[in-house]
């Protein structure tokens, strides 16, 4: 639906070419220091039109916080964030034509009506709401020294050979394409521009790490931390697969290779990706996310119109040649939301926690 989370919950609203995109965050505890500059920084990292590796649609994406914050701190009431759309160009979209590999076809057959302008609700423009909610989640996580970092480790046929521990998040922070490998940053850029010049698009791969996760986060059996992360990330536009820890590679291993042995309270490896039995074990939570190529390309393609007629169309509009670049910011936000939700849920997981909250320790 349009909401995500149990205790830390957000609801998003708005369409690509509507008046605004926004979200309402419910469950944020009172007393968390609110950092508006950080919120805007996260939105700026996601916003379009920053360079030639992104869509040429330029939006300022300035956040307006309408409620839930007073004198620099959260009040415990719903926090609403609004971002206005200021640079729409709806004439680029045809009302009766299904764009290949887009949600046009499925939305129409589900609802019998669709907002065709820029993909409407199915547009990645909606991810503004996710990034805003994720920024609030990170403000909460910061109070517990939990840090979430993401970047791009592969574009097209080019993959970094660095290990998870060797990825350079400082490089990603300063890179136009959020590259985790300085030696491949230019190759990533070249690959994107090559696809763009050919009127095509290209896929990408993102790595996310949660540092300092508290042990015990996750709600088995049906709200396991890894299943919630998969749920959250697979809901991001253009994501087709994720891996946690060794992921697919673990299916090629023996148990003796895949098991993370424990000595003196420390795991000697991290094939599990920091999660055992759906619960965090205190190690790094390592996630890889795989983005398909942006479906909006400028080559002739076969499709159909609403009347069922076969037609050939070249798309118009302004689109990312590689959606995974800005998508890395959205994945980071959704991981933060999952971790904040798990943190709050865990507060009532046992009697001792509740006794500490209410000063009833025996």
Swiss-Prot record:
The keyword Flavoprotein applies. Keywords: Amino-acid biosynthesis, Aromatic amino acid biosynthesis, FAD, Flavoprotein, FMN, Lyase, NADP. The keyword Amino-acid biosynthesis applies. It comes from the Bacteria. Reduced FMN (FMNH(2)). Its cofactor is FMNH2. InterPro entries: Chorismate_synth (IPR000453), Chorismate_synth_AroC_sf (IPR035904), Chorismate_synthase_CS (IPR020541). Its EC number is 4.2.3.5. Gene3D superfamilies: Chorismate synthase AroC (3.60.150.10). It holds the Pfam family Chorismate_synt. One of its GO terms (biological process) is chorismate biosynthetic process. FMN binds at residues 121-123, 237-238, 277, 292-296, 318. Homotetramer. NCBIfam families: aroC, PRK05382.1. This is Chorismate synthase. It comes from Campylobacter lari (strain RM2100 / D67 / ATCC BAA-1060).
